[in-house]
């Protein structure tokens, strides 16, 4: 039987911009994408800590080292610059193939979205 598990998480990232007129997605600094084991165009769940909004979108490439976290398109209505968010990816795995000691990649960031 397959189960869905958390694969990676960027925890308490600060939204640096929100662009309503951009084609939908979430722009993320590639340093954070790599650190969390995520991929460009991968589906993500986003949780806005400030307002409780939860939504799904996909990642697009942000400039390395920029700390960029930008809500694009309709997602820009669900958060604003300065909000804290959690970005989560999931994977489906065979339950009997998941190691007992499995640990997803979790990236904690500072107020400038730099990996701690």
Curated annotation (Swiss-Prot):
Reactions catalysed: L-aspartate + H(+) = beta-alanine + CO2
Catalytic residues, chain numbering: 25, 58
EC number: 4.1.1.11
Cofactors named for this entry: pyruvate
PTM notes: Is synthesized initially as an inactive proenzyme, which is activated by self-cleavage at a specific serine bond to produce a beta-subunit with a hydroxyl group at its C-terminus and an alpha-subunit with a pyruvoyl group at its N-terminus.
One Gene Ontology cellular component: cytosol
Pfam families: Asp_decarbox
Co-factor note (free text): Binds 1 pyruvoyl group covalently per subunit.
Keyword Cytoplasm recorded: yes
Signal peptide: none
Residues recorded with modification Pyruvic acid (Ser): 25
InterPro entries membership: Asp_de-COase-like_dom_sf (IPR009010), Asp_decarbox (IPR003190)
Keywords: Autocatalytic cleavage, Cytoplasm, Decarboxylase, Lyase, Pantothenate biosynthesis, Pyruvate, Schiff base, Zymogen
Involved pathway(s): Cofactor biosynthesis; (R)-pantothenate biosynthesis; beta-alanine from L-aspartate: step 1/1
Keyword ATP-binding attributed: no
Binding site for substrate: 57, 73-75
Entry GO MF terms: aspartate 1-decarboxylase activity
PANTHER family (UniProt xref): ASPARTATE 1-DECARBOXYLASE
Function statement: Catalyzes the pyruvoyl-dependent decarboxylation of aspartate to produce beta-alanine.
NCBIfam families linked to this entry: panD
Subunit details: Heterooctamer of four alpha and four beta subunits.
Protein name in the entry: Aspartate 1-decarboxylase
Organism: Leptospira borgpetersenii serovar Hardjo-bovis (strain JB197)
Higher taxonomy: Bacteria, Pseudomonadati, Spirochaetota, Spirochaetia, Leptospirales
Designated gene of the protein: panD
């Amino acid at each position: 039987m397959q189960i869905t598990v958390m694969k990676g998480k960027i925890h308490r990232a600060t939204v640096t911009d929100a662009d309503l007129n951009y084609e939908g997605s979430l722009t993320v600094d590639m340093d954070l994408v790599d650190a969390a084991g995520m991929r460009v165009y991968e589906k993500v769940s986003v949780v806005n800590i400030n307002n409780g909004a939860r939504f799904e979108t996909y990642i697009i490439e942000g400039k390395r080292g920029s700390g960029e976290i930008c809500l694009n398109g309709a997602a820009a209505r669900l958060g604003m610059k300065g909000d804290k968010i959690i970005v989560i990816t999931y994977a489906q795995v065979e339950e009997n193939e998941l190691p007992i000691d499995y640990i997803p990649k979790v990236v904690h960031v500072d107020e400038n979205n730099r990996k701690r």
